[in-house]
From Swiss-Prot:
Name by which UniProt lists this protein: Small ribosomal subunit protein uS3
One of the protein's GO biological processes: translation
Gene3D superfamilies: 3.30.300.20, Ribosomal protein S3, C-terminal domain
Sequence ranges assigned to domain KH type-2 in this UniProt record: 43-111
Stated family: Belongs to the universal ribosomal protein uS3 family.
Region called Disordered, residue ranges: 218-272
Native source species: Micrococcus luteus (strain ATCC 4698 / DSM 20030 / JCM 1464 / CCM 169 / CCUG 5858 / IAM 1056 / NBRC 3333 / NCIMB 9278 / NCTC 2665 / VKM Ac-2230)
Lineage: Bacteria, Bacillati, Actinomycetota, Actinomycetes, Micrococcales
UniProt feature, compositional bias: Low complexity: 253-272
Biased composition range(s): Basic and acidic residues: 229-238
Keywords: Ribonucleoprotein, Ribosomal protein, RNA-binding, rRNA-binding
Record's subunit section: Part of the 30S ribosomal subunit. Forms a tight complex with proteins S10 and S14.
Function summary: Binds the lower part of the 30S subunit head. Binds mRNA in the 70S ribosome, positioning it for translation.
């Protein structure tokens, strides 16, 4: 299961979080769940088209009643901001035109791009599009990630590798990448390289270590859960059942004594 599923969705609520934060319960046109979802997809498509050189890792979206907050995580914030903020103003204007709401645009820098799975996948894809040998590109990215502090990394390329007529998949791995361990902090990213032979898919898994018991407890405490109340109800039920048994014991004895008395009467009548 852990080998096939997307690691981000598999660990959602444990080590990862949603990239869209909003709630939709309206049935009005333009305010339904499907409308917000389509809008999120268009916002992310707008961020990726024409911004390949910016190294955008992820786009987080948060909605309020009349405002949309967009957080852009990028390895090169200067390209996104532009000269004197011209590029940021252009992006904000396009987003306001798309959503029809006020946009709060935040541009955040990725501190360690060598251990960001999405940025590593984009870097390998750019090298493949520039006709760099795929094995060389993969091994170079692995070495950079391990030097930057990653505990394990796996890179997989799928497609017509090296211009071969039949497509295949190859992967290289270094260190540990425990895909089945839920507390493992695994970053996952994917990207497509457009080459003259067709598209080559690049997938990257980066293992950054396990969450400690204290960190897991803090995350569980932050999430609302009814387990504690349920446990108390079960405990109280057990106590009540024990008390009921203690109260029923003398009743069963009395019932037994009462049953012997009417049984003796027919016996006497029979002898008579």
């Amino acid at each position: 299961m852990g080998q096939k599923i997307n690691p981000n969705g598999f660990r959602l609520g444990i080590t990862t979080d949603h990239v869209s934060h909003w709630f939709a319960d309206s049935h009005k046109e333009g305010q339904r769940y499907a409308d917000f979802l389509k809008e999120d997809v268009k916002i992310r498509e707008l961020m990726t088209t024409g911004m390949e050189r910016a190294g955008i890792s992820k786009v987080e979206i948060e909605r309020t009643r009349d405002r949309v907050r967009v957080d852009i995580h990028t390895a090169r914030p200067g390209i996104v901001i532009g000269r004197r903020g011209a590029e940021a103003d252009r992006i904000r204007g396009e987003l306001e035109k798309l959503t029809g709401k006020q946009i709060q645009l935040n541009i955040l820098e990725v501190k360690n791009p060598e251990t960001d799975a999405q940025l590593v996948a984009q870097g390998v894809a750019e090298q493949l599009a520039s006709r760099v040998a795929f094995r060389r590109a993969m091994k170079k990215a692995i070495q950079s990630a391990m030097r930057a502090g990653a505990q394990g990394i796996r890179i997989q390329c799928s497609g017509r590798l090296g211009g071969a007529e039949m497509s295949r998949s190859e992967f290289y791995r270094e260190g540990r990448v425990p895909l089945h361990t839920l507390r493992a902090n695994i970053d996952f990213g994917k990207f497509e390289a457009k080459t003259t032979f067709g598209r080559i898919g690049v997938k990257v898994w980066i293992y950054k270590g396990d969450l400690t018991a204290k960190e897991l407890a803090a995350k569980e405490a932050a999430q609302p859960s009814g387990r504690g109340r349920g446990g108390e109800r079960r405990g109280g039920g057990e106590r009540r059942r024990r008390n009921d048994r203690a109260e029923r014991a003398p009743r069963q004895e009395n019932a037994g004594a009462g049953a012997e008395t009417p049984a003796a009467a027919p016996a006497e009548g029979g002898n008579a």
